[in-house]
């Protein structure tokens, strides 16, 4: 019996498609092999890229779709050097090209503009030179473009403004010149995206272009006037103070008992669970570690390797098979149905938050009983450990480093709030969560471990996450967090940097001082005892005006009403010297008017009116 006509056509179509697929695979394989021959690979990362294998989908660091077409190339942080090749433009279905943190040099091929399905182009932390290709403006699906920390020159192509899908742009730390485009998608980006390009000018930077009119000053800050009954602010302050003090005692007493109990508690035992990996789980460029690999790295999660403990679990120091040091965070969470999917989602979101001042997630591990995150090891520890737990043989953090930490951590938090989609609220900003890399640059850690923010401005959680002394009053009383929750915690962290003190310290009771650092600082300001504020470890080696500015920023960040606190992007600008004086003066006027409306003296009126601007240098550098 003759075969049905449709079957004949199906066979013919299959015969046509199979050779076409082979041709595509050959073309993509040839393109990737050309890249390999142009790169120096000291660690044999590209060893599996065998040109005799027709299909590149079997190669490591290459991901294909169901049609055996290359959609992802992941070669980040692989110690590669050499140059890119124009043949990369033949990978027509490529969505992710990850070549960050290598030593690749030369120019960026204009043929990359042919990759019209590209979603992410990450070439940062390399040695690229020459211009940014104008052809990149053809990548209309591009969401992430990070070319920072190279040596790129020339102007920024205006064609990039047509990429309406662009969400993350980082061109900082290059040698770019000319005017920064301000139309299209570029209207969304702040000067952080273009920082440290001395020859750039225009609205996207802090300096006008030659011949252009000077920038208009920003409008004065006019916070919304809350509608409330007379005296409600005072009563609210009293209630907030009572809640904070009560919470302090509530946490302190059980903490003492728990510490005593832990001394008696037998050592916990770790049960070895076979590493079960789901081959279907792919989370971008993140490496999925086996549980056994991390057990070996941490000596079976030995107590001697514990770097710290926190609300999310313990952190262990580990050494991988390649000799690199890592910090392994072993999460403690209750296993619930659907928890695996939630974990994958949160890990993916964390991995997409890439910034100089954010701790980069290196990989993860997921088994039926374990959730682990792997980060680079920070040899210089945290700001908290450097302020209060450093060995006598090590010098204290100098004032210049503290200033750099303040600015770097502010930039990292601003990135989480303004450049992540959905935005990420940290919810536990404190000195212990600001880590220090080998150059003592601030690196914000532990972000994204709490529930991620959605597109709304606030998020109500079932449990308050945070540390006493750092928790904003509205978060403590309502469980309602927002960006301004992080701003409050950041302000407390600034006071830690200035004073060297803990945010919550029962030891201060011995001197009849406040246990809360914020209250202690306000008390000293009220009594005009500013000489007691600055960390004695600095030994007068600081700049008075900068100390005054940092105190002002800290107090603006820790205002009782979240609506009156600045956003982190504004904090960055104030730390860079833009707008602090105006904001401080405006805030003082508002406080004076508020006192008059309430027909009663504000409990902090003396230190509000006597701003640190009116203090003489001798008052900050006197005897301690």
UniProtKB/Swiss-Prot annotation:
- The signal peptide stretch is 1-25
Q: Identify the Pfam families for this entry.
A: LRR_1, LRRNT_2, PK_Tyr_Ser-Thr
State any GO BP term from the record. Answer: brassinosteroid mediated signaling pathway
Q: Where would you find the membrane-spanning parts of this chain? A: 238-258
**Alphabetically ordered keywords of this record:** ATP-binding, Cell membrane, Glycoprotein, Kinase, Leucine-rich repeat, Membrane, Nucleotide-binding, Receptor, Repeat, Serine/threonine-protein kinase, Signal, Transferase, Transmembrane, Transmembrane helix
Major localization listed first in the record, in broad terms: membrane
> Which reactions appear under catalytic activity for this entry?
L-seryl-[protein] + ATP = O-phospho-L-seryl-[protein] + ADP + H(+); L-threonyl-[protein] + ATP = O-phospho-L-threonyl-[protein] + ADP + H(+)
Q: From the Swiss-Prot or TrEMBL record, give the protein name.
A: LRR receptor kinase BAK1
Q: Which organism is it from?
A: Oryza sativa subsp. indica (Rice)
Instruction: Give the gene that encodes this protein.
Output: BAK1
């Amino acid at each position: 019996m003759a075969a049905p006509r449709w079957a004949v056509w199906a066979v013919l179509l299959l015969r046509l498609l199979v050779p076409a697929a082979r041709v595509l695979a050959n073309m993509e394989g040839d393109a990737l092999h050309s890249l390999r021959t142009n790169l120096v690979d000291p660690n044999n990362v590209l060893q599996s890229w065998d040109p005799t294998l027709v299909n590149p989908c079997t190669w490591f660091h290459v991901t294909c779709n169901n049609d055996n077409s290359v959609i992802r190339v992941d070669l980040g942080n692989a110690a590669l050097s050499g140059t890119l090749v124009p043949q990369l433009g033949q990978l027509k279905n490529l969505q992710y090209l990850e070549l960050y943190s290598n030593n690749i040099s030369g120019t960026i091929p204009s043929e990359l503009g042919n990759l019209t399905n590209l979603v992410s182009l990450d070439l940062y932390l390399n040695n690229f030179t020459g211009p940014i290709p104008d052809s990149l403006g053809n990548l209309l699906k591009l969401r992430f473009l990070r070319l920072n920390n190279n040596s790129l020159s020339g102007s920024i192509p205006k064609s990039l403004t047509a990429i309406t899908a662009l969400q993350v742009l980082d061109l900082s730390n290059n040698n770019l010149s000319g005017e920064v485009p301000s139309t299209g998608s570029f209207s969304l980006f702040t000067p952080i995206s273009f920082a440290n390009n001395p020859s750039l000018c225009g609205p996207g930077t802090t300096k006008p272009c030659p011949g252009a009119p000077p920038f208009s000053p920003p409008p004065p800050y006019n916070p919304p006037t809350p509608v409330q009954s007379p005296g409600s602010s005072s009563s609210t302050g009293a209630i907030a103070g009572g809640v904070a003090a009560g919470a302090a005692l509530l946490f302190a007493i059980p903490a003492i008992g728990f510490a005593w109990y832990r001394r008696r508690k037998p050592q916990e035992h770790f049960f070895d669970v076979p590493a079960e990996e789901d081959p279907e789980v792919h989370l971008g460029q993140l490496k999925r570690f086996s549980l056994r690999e991390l057990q070996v790295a941490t000596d079976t999660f030995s107590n001697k390797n514990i770097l710290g403990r926190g609300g999310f679990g313990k952190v262990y120091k580990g050494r991988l098979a390649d000799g690199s040091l890592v910090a392994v965070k072993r999460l403690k969470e209750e296993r619930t149905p659907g928890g695996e999917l939630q974990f994958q989602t949160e890990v993916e979101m964390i991995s997409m938050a890439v910034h100089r001042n954010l701790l980069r997630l290196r990989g993860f591990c997921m088994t039926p009983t374990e959730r682990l995150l792997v980060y680079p090891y920070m040899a210089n520890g945290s700001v908290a450990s450097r302020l209060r737990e450093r060995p006598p043989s090590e010098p204290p953090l100098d004032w210049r480093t503290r200033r750099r930490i303040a600015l770097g951590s502010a930039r990292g938090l601003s990135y989480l709030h303004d450049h992540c989609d959905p935005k990420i609220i940290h919810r536990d900003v404190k000195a212990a969560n600001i880590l220090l890399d080998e150059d003592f640059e601030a690196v914000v850690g532990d972000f994204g471990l709490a529930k991620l923010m959605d597109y709304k401005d606030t998020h109500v959680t079932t449990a308050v996450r945070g540390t006493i002394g750092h928790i904003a009053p509205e978060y403590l009383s309502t469980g309602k967090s927002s960006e301004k929750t992080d701003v409050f915690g950041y302000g407390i962290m600034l006071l830690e940097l200035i004073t060297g003190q803990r945010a919550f310290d029962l030891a201060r009771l011995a001197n009849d001082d406040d246990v809360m650092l914020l209250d202690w600082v306000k008390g000293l300001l009220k009594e005009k005892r500013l000489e007691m504020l600055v960390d004695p470890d600095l030994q007068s080696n600081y700049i008075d005006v900068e100390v005054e500015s940092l105190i002002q920023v800290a107090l603006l960040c820790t205002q009782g009403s979240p609506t009156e606190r600045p956003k982190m992007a504004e904090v960055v600008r104030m730390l860079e010297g833009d707008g602090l004086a105006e904001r401080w003066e405006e805030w003082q006027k508002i406080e004076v008017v508020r006192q008059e409306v309430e027909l009663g003296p504000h409990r902090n009126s003396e230190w509000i009116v006597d701003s640190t601007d009116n203090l003489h240098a001798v008052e900050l550098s006197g005897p301690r």
